């Protein structure tokens, strides 16, 4: 052992790693062993070096000093320590010399020095196999990196791939290693490290830190496996939790505090809605006003029935059910029979209703019963005896557990091995990320099918939800203003131009108290939906909007660059024709794809990853057909224009670009110049211009008559509709319908197509 300069013990040292061979750890493990001193102060000091790159004093380190050091950016520093812990230990070859200059790398570790106090300034090395190569030399003057050393001693260090490492350019190494004095005195204790991490990160932040780091090193399989193994080493002590201890009986005050905490925690998880605020306040008041009722409800087994005589229980339950639709509460007007979690509510006039709460949700039933208590309410006590404050003793509890074991299900061959194996993939899948909002409100989904770009546009969404209205809303001035039921109990229908959406309001006999159902049809992203809900409050007395559910998605795509567009509807066994709509419908796995003219499709019912998979399975057979003629340059041009403008290309824009491309090809010019212009934004457009919009409100700027003339052109004193052959018709599709009188020009076009597509297309064009 030697005592280098004191600078080594104040800051963490970043070392270059030249040898990434897997045998490095084996060379050390075969020859020597390091003592596992699990002192908390040393573990805190190691964590500080990994997070802050500096020591807190070794054995004098404590949690207060660590809190003060991490206070500026606790999440950033802790995540840096987590990433280094995931990379694992690195045994760094070293030669330590004493003050007289004698090398210590060739000697065994002094057993007496290993038992010294960890606070002294001595570096503990671990003996191993002989090593020759790049390594570290520590002398009384400092530390040096040498490309050629001979040693069999190793330092305990930690790998690091941080971009914030103060690495020198002349090192030219991929990885680094972090070393501090405490690492030479003890091994890393994963359990203590996880406890320190939990002090600054939640479990969700810890999982997110791990997932983002693993995705960054996904290409290196060995490194990813090492990170996953160290991740489960940090969580290893959680696989076999300690058995629960028998809790002694608590006093009535402590029991009431525990029960009240459970109710308040459940109420705190409710959605933050204005309509639930009075109910929250009433529950908090009744926790203090009715302690005996709370104790009786908590002592009642869940299989027993609760009887109440209170007003307003039905309204409270309907309000909470709308706010939390995933917790289903069944309501009956007749006795449903023996079911657990039942509540019988008797209101004025002798009206009785039975409520059956979901299993293992006793706190839900207790909370709603407590909310109904008031001056005139009364809780009918059950026949179950109230437990005493003392409770059963430990011998009675053990006998009860043994008796319950007699009737437990017997072991089978599948469950005979204990403890059950833990499947690591079930806890965490780094490659999967759930993005429900981004998938539900994605305006454009781009994918590549065998190198062919396709953009899928979200046409519209049908959203169902409930709203609670202000009872002081507008009154009807006359009897004639009262809305009449029209279609499917729709009493009102609103159409809004900006943002474009429609709202249908359904009939409800208690719209102010229990809410009414609405149906919203909207297209756009999540911000457009929030904007639409804000506009809804301008013409309706909306007090609360309850959780929504998207009932249907409609998406549209165009196969840009497919020259023979009739291929999508010909010669397919999975396509049948509809009678009332001009489209061919392909149905697979319960979802329909309607193919219109000019290779345009509409998909319903699916979104997100399901939509991408459905489009891929539908378009792959078409694009891989031997008869398909694909123009990848056109596909790149139109995909670029669609991606830049986040909208489908309309008829006039489509025909202009098609003719521009064919003119360049006809003149034997560089057709990729059109692609470069598209990428430069020269063909960008707005959905609000008259030639692209479908909204009459926007077309009315120039007048209705001019709006109708937009999709038509004057050809030989005759009006011709541009979209007659389809909005997405390409040059090959509309070529046969133009230039009937100019035979010379048409023959030149046919020769051009034969030159670009092949001689087999000449006969095909003459037939058309």
Swiss-Prot record:
Residue span of region Disordered: 102-125
Biased composition (Basic and acidic residues): 104-119
Pfam family, one: Herpes_UL87
InterPro entries: Herpes_UL87_C
Domain of life: Viruses
Family from the record: Belongs to the herpesviridae UL87 family.
Protein name (database record): Gene 24 protein
Gene source species: Equine herpesvirus 2 (strain 86/87)
Taxonomic path: Viruses, Duplodnaviria, Heunggongvirae, Peploviricota, Herviviricetes
